[in-house]
């Protein structure tokens, strides 16, 4: 939709999300994705068969997708344990130290390979370990930001504080 004003007016009254229902599996999926990304990048720079790591990553993403659709958080944790074993089995016996590089910048650039000119692929092809950007801290930071904004009277909330308390 196109707007000339300062906000995007795209009201869709029939589209409602039950956050209480989807938040647990969404958070589990985000943690799984972050962990799988770390496993992939730590492995791919240390092995000669880069395709094996990519295939393994794709396989685990497909398996996780099925579990997300069933909202099976416990099975996702078991799948992650299996992924750790599988990625570890690809590694050589001797520990190979690699240079490490993190991808920083605007979130869109960090997560969009075309926007960042496929820098992660280039780095891994040159046996440099990519410290991938994580989605979990990006989203959990909003809880910290919320507290700071409330304390500084920059935000009013209709949501009870116990929802956000630890």
Enumerate the predicted regions with their spans.
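An N-terminal assembly and electron-transfer interface module characteristic of large anaerobic redox
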Residues: 1-166
């Amino acid at each position: 939709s196109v707007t000339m004003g300062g906000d995007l007016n795209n009201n869709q009254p029939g589209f409602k999300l039950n956050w209480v229902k989807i938040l647990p599996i969404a958070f589990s999926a985000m943690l799984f994705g972050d962990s799988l990304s770390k496993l992939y990048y730590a492995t791919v720079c240390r092995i000669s068969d880069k395709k094996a790591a990519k295939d393994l990553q794709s396989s685990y993403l497909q398996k996780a997708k099925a579990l997300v659709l069933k909202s099976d958080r416990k099975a996702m944790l078991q799948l992650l344990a299996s992924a750790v074993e599988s990625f570890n089995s690809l590694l050589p016996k001797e520990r190979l130290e690699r240079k490490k590089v993190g991808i920083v910048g605007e979130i869109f650039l960090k997560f969009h390979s075309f926007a960042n000119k496929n820098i992660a692929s280039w780095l891994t092809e040159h046996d440099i370990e990519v410290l991938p950007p994580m989605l979990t801290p990006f989203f959990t930071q909003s809880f910290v930001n919320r507290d700071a904004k409330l304390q500084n009277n920059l935000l009013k909330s209709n949501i009870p504080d116990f929802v956000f308390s630890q």
